[in-house]
């Protein structure tokens, strides 16, 4: 049996009751079938009538079988208005189920003909006083429909659930759509549904990574490393603990390595890492001397997730205007940041931070450089914070003695005792002549160094040859002291204030050139000049007077200084006169 067979039983239920309900002849009946209205030509006696009522439901059921498609979804047909409205009866109630299930003719649908529909839109009685709907309008409508729809309905595949909604409103939809447009629209909807791409696997997990502890930010595209610290997890807490941020990275591998290092610090070598444990042997040794928080802070500083102007050193930032480096230390001075100053290089700013960290946090402070670089004892004992120029002076005071200047260990406060002077060995260029000219008119006052005049105020030292057996004179207010070339010692030595220096038979000797720091203010700066003495001096008298002749000082390549470690080779450099 065909599934499209739909009908309503003829029941004489309250036949006489409905006889008195007669529809107005001026009413145009219509049914909304697939968006198109069909009008009753027999009821169109007055074409100017603007009142529209809904056609009875059986007609809509018949046409619904022709307009349904196998691929389309079920539609809810809206039967607007009531089946029959009594205009003159004020006591007429709203539409009832009996109006739709009243007396009618059985409807049977075939592919050849369509049965007649007995009765009009209003059930006026058995003799049908309202007129009948002609088949010409239905055939015209069926002629416009695709044949496939009718065939599909014949096969019984188009039977869908029917939903009738009763609405007391008398207004109808003014937008008229053709059935062809609806069919085309239905196909377009089906095609669009099929054309919609399904979400692929790649679209899921935009912030995930193939590495453990690494996520990719969906906005910036950078990789972030996080670690869940379950050591602070409270009892009864369902979460993993506290999330520790390890920094942002441009490369996924760098973020994965940062997670590995943090995991090794938190959970030891038994934890699971992204890369082999053998690649972190050096880092494992370094992290042993740091706490978890300190090591996490170091990982963050090494990341590329810092804001603009940040430095690789701890506590150092770059000023956005003048470009100089600023140093700050936090959690001091009332749990606030302490400004340490502005520096030309980030290394100097890092040193200032280290000094402040040592001052406030002692030996457990985390510094940018090795703590052995600083005089920790002096920093801790200092009443103030040695930052900037004060730190530089402290650094220079603690700097080891340069190798070119060998300072004697015996320091004497007496001006006549030269044991506290610095004995410097100076090597001069080969072939340079050193001339000492003595003025006959003014004894022991002027000297000439390669034609340059040294005033008597600069150096009051008197030199005399060994043949004259005169001692060199010294002024107690002068820098230079008596230098005697005595015959009691070997010809390869020179006596400086009673101390014999220059053993070994070399070509040149060193004389004290700088005084002690405590007595430096008492002497003129120009007296700190270097003087050389030849191993063998010969006196040559000029015809014009008793002037020492020019002597050539060919200094050897090896020179020793006299001190506790006598015999050690002193470094060489070139000395020039400051005048």
UniProtKB/Swiss-Prot annotation:
Q: Where in the cell is it found?
A: Nucleus
Its Gene Ontology cellular component terms are: nucleus
The identity of this protein, by name, is AP2-like ethylene-responsive transcription factor BBM2
Q: Which PANTHER family match?
A: AP2-LIKE ETHYLENE-RESPONSIVE TRANSCRIPTION FACTOR, AP2-LIKE ETHYLENE-RESPONSIVE TRANSCRIPTION FACTOR BBM
Residue ranges: DNA binding: 210-276, 312-370
Q: Does the keyword Zinc apply?
A: no
Note the Gene3D superfamilies from the entry.
Answer: AP2/ERF domain
Which function does this protein serve?
Transcription factor that promotes cell proliferation, differentiation and morphogenesis, especially during embryogenesis.
Report whether Lipoprotein shows up as a keyword of the record: no
Against PROSITE patterns, the record matches this protein to: AP2_ERF
Name the organs or tissues of expression. Mostly expressed in developing seeds.
* Predominant location category: nucleus
SUPFAM superfamilies registered for this protein in UniProt: DNA-binding domain
Q: Which UniProt keywords apply?
A: Developmental protein, DNA-binding, Nucleus, Repeat, Transcription, Transcription regulation
Q: Secretion signal: which residues?
A: none
């Amino acid at each position: 049996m065909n599934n499209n067979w739909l009908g309503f039983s003829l029941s004489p239920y309250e036949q006489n009751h409905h006889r008195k309900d007669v529809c107005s002849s001026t009413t145009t009946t219509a049914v909304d079938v697939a968006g198109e209205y069909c009008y009753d030509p027999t009821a169109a006696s007055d074409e100017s009538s603007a009142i529209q009522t809904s056609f009875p439901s059986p007609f809509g059921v018949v046409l619904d079988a022709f307009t349904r498609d196998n691929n389309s979804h079920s539609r809810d047909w809206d039967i607007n208005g009531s089946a029959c409205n009594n205009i003159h009866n004020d006591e007429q109630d709203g539409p009832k189920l009996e109006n739709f299930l009243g007396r009618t003719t059985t409807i049977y649908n075939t592919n050849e003909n369509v049965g007649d529909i007995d009765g009009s839109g209003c059930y006026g009685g058995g003799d049908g006083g309202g007129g009948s709907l002609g088949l010409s309008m239905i055939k015209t409508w069926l002629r416009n429909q695709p044949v496939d729809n009718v065939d599909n309905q014949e096969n019984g595949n188009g039977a869908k659930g029917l939903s009738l909604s009763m609405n007391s409103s008398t207004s109808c939809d003014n937008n008229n759509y053709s059935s062809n447009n609806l069919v085309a629209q239905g196909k377009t909807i089906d095609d669009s549904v099929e054309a919609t791409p399904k979400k692929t696997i790649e679209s899921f997990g935009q912030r995930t990574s193939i590495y453990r502890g690494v996520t990719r930010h969906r906005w910036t595209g950078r990789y972030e490393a996080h670690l869940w610290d379950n050591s602070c997890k409270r009892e009864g807490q369902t979460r993993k603990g506290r999330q520790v941020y390890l920094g942002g990275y441009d490369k996924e591998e760098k973020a994965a390595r940062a997670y590995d290092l943090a995991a090794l610090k938190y959970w030891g070598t038994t934890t699971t890492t992204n890369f082999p444990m053998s690649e972190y042997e050096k880092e494992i040794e370094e992290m042993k001397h740091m706490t978890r928080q300190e090591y996490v802070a170091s990982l963050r500083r090494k990341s590329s997730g810092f804001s603009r102007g940040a430095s690789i050193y701890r506590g150092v930032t770059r000023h956005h205007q003048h470009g100089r480096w600023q140093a700050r230390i936090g959690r001091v001075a009332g749990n606030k940041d302490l400004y340490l100053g502005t520096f030309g290089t980030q290394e100097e700013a890092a040193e200032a931070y280290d000094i402040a960290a040592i001052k406030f946090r002692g030996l457990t402070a985390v510094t940018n450089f090795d703590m052995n670089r600083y005089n920790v004892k002096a920093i801790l004992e200092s009443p103030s914070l040695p930052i900037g120029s004060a730190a530089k002076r402290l650094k220079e005071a603690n700097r080891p003695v340069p190798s070119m200047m060998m300072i004697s260990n015996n320091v004497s406060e007496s001006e006549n005792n030269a044991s506290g002077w610095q004995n410097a060995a100076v090597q001069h260029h080969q072939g340079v002549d050193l001339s000492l000219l003595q003025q006959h008119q003014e004894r022991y006052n002027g000297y000439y160094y390669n034609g340059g005049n040294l005033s008597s105020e600069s150096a009051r030292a008197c030199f005399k040859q060994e043949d004259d057996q005169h001692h060199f004179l010294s002024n107690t207010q002068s820098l230079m002291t008596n230098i005697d070339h005595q015959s009691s010692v070997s010809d390869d030595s020179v006596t400086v204030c009673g101390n014999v220096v220059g053993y070994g038979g070399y070509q040149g000797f060193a004389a004290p050139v700088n005084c002690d720091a405590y007595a430096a203010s008492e002497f003129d700066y120009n007296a700190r000049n270097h003087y050389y003495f030849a191993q063998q001096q010969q006196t040559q008298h000029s015809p014009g007077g008793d002037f020492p002749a020019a002597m050539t000082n060919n200094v050897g390549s090896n020179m020793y200084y006299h001190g506790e470690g006598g015999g050690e080779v002193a470094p060489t450099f070139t000395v020039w006169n400051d005048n």
